[in-house]
């Protein structure tokens, strides 16, 4: 069984090679001439300036410094019908973009039905990425 688990973990790591090595703050990206991050596979991911400005308009100055991009949308092997977003500011942004602010509570983790993934990626194509998470 251990060999199978190692193979699965290797494949998941390969599938997730599009994830950033490190995320940058929205503030830092807005100050860059070419807003980009380096991915695990060595390539670069570029952010659309208008998308960065959209996010900045949703947040106060302190939150602009705290928001790390791209926002990672987690897809778990256990809860395949759900997606998860982590981080207080990240959760706030996703809720605002989806119009889920009614009765807004500050949360550090947001679980949503998986069908929201397409809507989030359509509205924020360069500032979000999805990651496959292995859970046993």
Curated annotation (Swiss-Prot):
Coiled-coil annotated spans: none
Short name of any one Pfam family annotated for the protein: DUF61
Family: Belongs to the UPF0216 family.
HAMAP family: UPF0216 (MF_00585)
NCBIfam families per the UniProt record, alphabetical: PRK04115.1
Name this protein carries in UniProt: UPF0216 protein PH0358
Organism: Pyrococcus horikoshii (strain ATCC 700860 / DSM 12428 / JCM 9974 / NBRC 100139 / OT-3)
């Amino acid at each position: 069984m251990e060999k199978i688990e190692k193979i699965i973990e290797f494949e998941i790591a390969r599938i997730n090679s599009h994830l950033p090595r490190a995320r940058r703050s929205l503030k830092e990206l807005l100050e860059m001439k070419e807003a980009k991050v380096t991915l695990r596979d060595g390539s670069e991911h570029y952010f659309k300036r208008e998308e960065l400005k959209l996010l900045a308009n949703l947040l106060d100055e302190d939150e602009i410094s705290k928001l790390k991009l791209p926002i990672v949308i987690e897809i778990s092997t256990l809860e395949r019908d759900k997606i998860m977003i982590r981080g207080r500011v990240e959760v706030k942004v996703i809720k605002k973009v989806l119009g889920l602010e009614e009765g807004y509570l500050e949360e550090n983790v947001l679980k949503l039905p998986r069908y929201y993934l397409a809507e989030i990626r359509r509205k924020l194509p360069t500032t979000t990425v999805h990651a496959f998470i292995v859970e046993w």
